[in-house]
Amino acid sequence: MIGIVTNGLPFQNRFFAEEEFKYLYDDILHIRELHRYDLANYDTLILSCRLDIPHLKRYQSQFLSFIESGKRLIIFGEVLDNWFPTIDWVDSEVNFSWWVQDGGDLPMEEQNKTHPLFKYVALRDMKWHYHGSFLAPDGAQSLLDIPDGRSLFYVDNVSFNGELVVTTLDPMFHIGLGFIDQSRPFLHGIAKWLREEEGQ
């Protein structure tokens, strides 16, 4: 079972209205009422983009208990104000226009290419822009790095009993607002990978 956590903001509501992504999740959980849900019912919990920091901090202990119980926690977008332990986030200037510049590029490189996610996601699907980067913990697998060696996407199976998946990418935001075409194949890739993992 996969649960996805939302603020209930307009872009999130538009995302949840998209029929093509309903197979990504089984239940929608509102973060303001997270205490009403039994998180033990879920194998994977997705924290969608741009959730309220005060509520994330309020429920930090529940998220930690969830992942320490051997489950998978996925965090999309910025991880601000040190709300989650082990995550080293640094803001960066956002390059919104590299694709319209002559010879423009947004340098990044796949890592650990044998990870099963790469059966469903290509580099082009992850390349639009980013708001910051992570320093992946020792022993974690970075899947996408920028030239300075920091990560845009990593999988951590060493810091907790479960699996922490963290990416700077914010596909639900862009799908909900109707721009950044790459966000769709990227999120479909995530969904296919999760459903494959669920079936094992």
Regions found by a protein language model. Give the residues of each.
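Aromatic-Pro/Gly-enriched surface loop or interdomain linker
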Residues: 1-44, 189-200
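Structural motif
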Residues: 4-10, 31-32, 47-51, 76-79, ...
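Catalytic beta-strand/loop cores that center a nucleophilic Ser/Cys/Thr
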Residues: 13-19, 104-179, 183, 198
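Short amphipathic alpha-helical segments and helix-helix/interface helices
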Residues: 16-18, 60-67, 132, 187, ...
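Short, flexible loop segments at the rims of nucleotide/cofactor-binding pockets, characterized by
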Residues: 22-27, 49-53, 142-145
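Alpha-helical scaffolding within the catalytic cores
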Residues: 29-34, 58, 149-152
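Short, well-ordered alpha-helix to beta-strand connector turns
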Residues: 41-44, 70, 140
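A glycine-rich, often tryptophan-bearing local segment used as a flexible ligand/cofactor-contacting loop or short
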Residues: 54-125
